[in-house]
Amino acid sequence: LPEAMLVDWLRVPTDRRMSALFEAFRRGYSIEDVRDLTGGVTRWFLHRFEKMAAVETEIRAAGELGMTPSEIQPEEMRYWKGCGFTDLHIADALSGFPTSGFKQLSKGKDEFAVTSRRHELSIHPRFRMVDSCAAEFAAVTPYYYTTYECGTKSIGVDYVPNLNLSKKKRIVVIGSGPIRIGQGIEFDYGCVHAVGAIQDLGHEAIIINNNPETVSTDFDT
């Protein structure tokens, strides 16, 4: 990515900005440099991006020393996952981000190898309840997110489902993901109606989505 284009992506708030923030810290930009270019993004967020870029460099360095997914130690896997890296990103970084692309990673070095190692180490995400009232008062909702956590002591509440509470059949609805500005919400609308139809039939509906700002992920859906 040319430097001038990176600067443009930092200055203009579009869907490219998050990738641009990460790339800027990869290239050694300081917190203040990035803050000035973005017009004042809160330092708290910038520090998180800077940290992720530093950890990515650590993963890549480990790969340069010959580490393969099968050699990842438990504390390393927990830390990398807790910092927000996907299994695919870890595999790609260990391989040095080859120009051929992550799809061409060889067996034993690909995403599946990292996932297999993570399962072997019994490292899985936790389910945490979303505080829909921002700590203003206690709230219990059937609204959860997954996390591996890292760095700071958790104040979240783990969700441990009691599958014996209900004998109803459970059906999972896969959400449509992020919705861009200008795009219709018909896919999300369809998910909500699918949930309603499942409930009308007497079953339990579980929706899995990765868009916290849309109707299908509202706590009362």
Each language-model region and where it sits:
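ATP-dependent carboxylate/acyl-activation modules
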Residues: 1-221
